[in-house]
Amino acid sequence: MADQLTEDQISEFKEAFSLFDKDGDGCITTKELGTVMRSLGQNPTEAELQDMINEVDADGNGTIDFPEFLNLMARKMKDTDSEEELKEAFRVFDKDQNGFISAAELRHVMTNLGEKLTDEEVDEMIREADVDGDGQINYDEFVKVMMAK
């Protein structure tokens, strides 16, 4: 499954993996998974976190290593994001629920994920997605970017 990913996708997933793997030991624990999910406004129980880990923990050691993470991401990409998942993701970014993601909102979520971006990087991300040029990302623009991944 993971062998159908491009090099770009793999390096993107490596970056995502390192956001989760806070201590850099090459494994994602339930604690690390919980930290990231809470920073995104989710509130999973210990049992839910354990279930998520168990779902992809091929070797049964209780953590997710990078190959297991890649398999998870490849599977997730195959069941391309449902409308509901996209709406949920958009809501995470659209803090004031006004239907637009501003540069400030994008920076806020990325900072919560531990991703410190310069103003230029944030502006560049907005520009890439901002089809109508109004300086923010609406839902349709967000969907386009997510589907292009």
UniProtKB/Swiss-Prot annotation:
Q: Where, per the database record, does this protein carry N-acetylalanine?
A: A2
Keywords, A to Z? Answer: Acetylation, Calcium, Metal-binding, Methylation, Repeat
Q: Can you tell me which residues bind Ca(2+) 4?
A: D130, D132, D134, Q136, E141
Gene Ontology CC annotations of this record = cytoplasm
Please give the tissue specificity annotation from the record for this chain.
High expression of PCM5 and 8 in stolon tips and stems, moderate in roots, and low in leaves. Steady-state expression of PCM6 in all the tissues tested, except in the leaves where the expression is lower.
Superkingdom assignment: Eukaryota
Q: Where does Ca(2+) 3 bind?
A: D94, D96, N98, E105
The EF-hand domain, residue ranges? 8-43, 44-79, 81-116, 117-149
* Disulphides: none
Query: Which conditions up-regulate this protein?
Result: PCM5, PCM6 and PCM8 are not induced by touching.
Query: Record keywords: Hydrolase included?
Result: no
Query: Matching CDD domains, A to Z?
Result: EFh (cd00051)
Ligand binding (Ca(2+) 1): D21, D23, D25, C27, E32
* GO molecular-function term, one example from the UniProt record: calcium ion binding
The reply to whether Metal-binding figures as a keyword in the UniProt entry is yes
Matches recorded under SUPFAM superfamilies: EF-hand
Please tell me where Ca(2+) 2 binds in this chain.
Answer: D57, D59, N61, T63, E68
State what this protein does.
Calmodulin mediates the control of a large number of enzymes, ion channels and other proteins by Ca(2+). Among the enzymes to be stimulated by the calmodulin-Ca(2+) complex are a number of protein kinases and phosphatases.
Q: What else is known?
A: The expression of PCM7 was not investigated.
Say which family it is in: Belongs to the calmodulin family.
Q: What is this protein called?
A: Calmodulin-5/6/7/8
Taxonomic path: Eukaryota, Viridiplantae, Streptophyta, Embryophyta, Tracheophyta
